[in-house]
Curated annotation (Swiss-Prot):
GO CC, alphabetical: cytoplasm
Top-level taxonomic group: Bacteria
Described purpose of this protein according to its UniProt entry: Involved in peptide bond synthesis. Stimulates efficient translation and peptide-bond synthesis on native or reconstituted 70S ribosomes in vitro. Probably functions indirectly by altering the affinity of the ribosome for aminoacyl-tRNA, thus increasing their reactivity as acceptors for peptidyl transferase.
Record-level GO BP terms: peptide biosynthetic process
Known pathway: Protein biosynthesis; polypeptide chain elongation
Keywords attached to this entry: Cytoplasm, Elongation factor, Protein biosynthesis
Protein name: Elongation factor P
GO MF entries: translation elongation factor activity
Compartments reported by the entry: Cytoplasm
Length: 189
């Protein structure tokens, strides 16, 4: 275990609090006008999946567990969960639906992800920063509509809705940021 200050904790880190391990879901630093800056951390207990919210002063020390980040390739999904393979030794692991969370929408066969492992158990999953998806449907552009926002809603091939520029139409392949579902650019393929 390593002691770190609360403000340096990030999503996906594993913390030990009161002898139990937690995976960080969100970590936000707040600097109120008066008073001490604090870090609000939402976590999930690894043993039973209970979600907990903690608030620490940004300079407080918290214990971070050592986790191993290992590249894995996504194979398939079934009733057990999501199956991944380590390309170095061909070991396969199953990641449950709760650990995957909302990220499952971006998984594509053969995609390489970084899985955080603690004593052989998958705790968190990091997708590539950008994925290429196809626009399934989008609204038509209204000419001369310059007073409002220049982005329009669109439905992606994985079922997620996002905003795209007016020149993007259905059938176009685009690059999307997995962190916030935002449009990055038109795909170059």
């Amino acid at each position: 275990m390593v002691k770190v200050i609360a403000s340096s904790v990030r999503k996906g880190n594993v913390l030990e609090v009161d002898g139990k391990l937690y995976v960080v879901l969100t970590a936000q630093n707040f600097h109120p006008g008066k008073g001490t800056p604090v870090t609000q951390i939402d976590m999930r207990r690894i043993v039973d999946g209970v979600k907990v919210s903690e608030r620490w002063r940004t300079t407080e020390q918290v214990e971070r567990a050592f986790v191993e980040d290992v590249n894995h390739q996504f194979l398939y999904e079934d009733g057990e969960g999501f199956h991944f393979m380590n390309p170095e030794n061909y070991d396969q692991i199953v990641v449950d639906v709760e650990t995957m969370g909302d990220q499952k929408a971006y998984l594509q066969e053969g995609m390489t992800c970084v899985i955080s492992m603690y004593e052989g158990v998958a705790l968190a999953l990091d997708l590539p920063r950008h994925v290429t998806l196809e626009i399934m449907e989008t609204e038509p552009v209204v000419k001369g509509q310059t007073a409002s926002s220049s982005y329009k809603p669109a439905m992606l091939s994985n079922g997620i809705r996002t905003l795209v520029p007016p020149h993007i139409n259905a059938g176009t392949r685009v690059v999307i940021a997995t962190e916030d579902n935002s449009y990055v650019e038109r795909a170059k393929d």
